Curated annotation (Swiss-Prot):
Gene3D superfamilies: lambda repressor-like DNA-binding domains. Disulfide bonds: none annotated. This is Uncharacterized HTH-type transcriptional regulator MJ0586. One of its GO terms (molecular function) is DNA binding. Keywords: DNA-binding, Transcription, Transcription regulation. It comes from Methanocaldococcus jannaschii (strain ATCC 43067 / DSM 2661 / JAL-1 / JCM 10045 / NBRC 100440).
Amino acid sequence: MRDSIMQMCELCGKLTDKLYKVIIEGSEMNVCKECAKFGKSPKTYSRLGKKTIIGKGTITTNKQVKKPIKRRRDIFDTLPMLREDYGDVIREAREKRGLSIEELAKKLKMKASTLQKFERYELEPNEKEIKILEKELKISLTESIGEETSYYGGRDEDGFTLGDFIKIKK
């Protein structure tokens, strides 16, 4: 009698002695007979499509032709962010003009306590307040987030990976 090795289906996890290689959602997988119906045979599947040669030209007829993938732009890449040192910038600009908190608050039509909270980092100004402060004090409280803050992958020597948090049951 022949001993067969039981293998696990990559889709449902069922143990079986025969696996079928199929393409499911663009990924090649080894699956059981029941799950094989959800995929296409790698022999018939083509990412580029079927080509029909007519004379000197080649025409692609399959609808599975993929367009080049463009990098999606994140809306947060272009939004201005409040500077980390906004409180010091506000205080220094106010002191440079020789104004007290109460005098500046009166000019800005703002509460003195609100202005104090900005300077002590207890409260962050909203967009409207940022514009008012920037215009009156002739300062910049925002900075643009550029591509340099994007993460492109790779392992950070000090950082964690998902594998550091996964517990595997045996």
